[in-house]
Structures are given as C-alpha cells and as structure tokens.
Amino acid sequence: FYSTTFGNLFSSKKVKYNSKNHVENLSIFLNEKIKMINFNPNKLPKNLISEAKKLLPKSNYIGFSITQGNEYRKKSWSIYKFISLANKSLIKNKTPVFFIEKNQEHIIDKIKNQVPGALFPETKSEMPCPALVTALSSRLDHAVSIDNGVMHMISLADIPMIVLFGPTNSEKFAPKNNHVKILDSKKIYKTKNIGSITVDDVYNLI
C-alpha cells in the first residue's frame, strides 16, 4: 500500500523519497519503472464517439469545466471570470463549450444569458457519463479547467489544457501529459486564493 499521508505513515513499505513526483516515488516503491501511456480516445465505445460528433460537429471549440465536486476546499474560479474568458475566446473564433450537469440550471442560465452561442452538450444527450466527457473533449481545440474530476476526464483526450490551481497541490493532482499548462496561484502570486489568477493570465495561454 502506497500513501504519502503523514510522512508515509500508512505505506506498507518504508522508503525514503527525494522527489515530490508521485510517479517517480511509486516507481521506487514498486522497484519497477512506471511508463506513462496516453489514452487513445478512439478506443472509446463507437456510440459515444458518434454522440460526441453529433453534439460537436464542427471545429474551433474551447471547453470549460468550472464546478468543483467537493466544497471543503475553495478550488473554484469565479464564474464571472469564466464568462469573461469565454467571451474573449469568441474573438479568436472559438465556440465556448461548458461541461456542466443538467441539475446546475442556475449556472447554465447565467452563462447562456452572458455568453452568446455557448454550448452545453451534456444537457442535450441521453447518455451522459464520464466517457462521453472524454469523447466530447476529443472534439475540442483547447480546454480550461479547475482542479476537479472533469479535468481528469478531459485530460484523457490528450488535448491542450490550461488547469487552474489554488489551495490544492498542482504537482500532485495535475494531469500528467505534455499538453497541460498549469496556473498555480501559490507559485504565481504566493497565495492559495485561486481568485488571484486573472482572466488575462489564462487568455494569454490560449
């Protein structure tokens, strides 16, 4: 059992680690080199790939994942900053695509009222599931996300991503692929407040 909690107290094997990289540490723990393998979204079920193409049939899409699952840590970036970023992306001829569940009507309505042409594909599908999010993400040019579960679903599509971090550990939780750009408020502004990250900080990376 591998865990770094309380200085590796619960790990079944006591090993001294010199890195904060969990993949490197796990390789030492298992005494075996761990290889990074990118997921191929084309191996998803064909019905989900077809559904994604039906929902997002064109190109120049940019995705946004804005809601956090756990409320105990303030990981959310202001919805108004996401709205501003989505509207600025229209200047680059990008169509904003929001990954928001159907039960978040108040958020969806707020975005619809302020972002012309914004799409909410999950609300139009009868087969919403994590795999559909990955299939939809494969149709995107870029994606912007906070640290949440959808971030990992998007990252499986292996597309350019910008991920925003505040109180959580970007080195631990950020997707491990070559297309991810990280904006960590702790490293940029020396604060855990994710709100310190500006719209232009993100826009300049798109």
Model region roles, listed by residue range:
Residues 1-206:
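Catalytic machinery of carbohydrate-active enzymes
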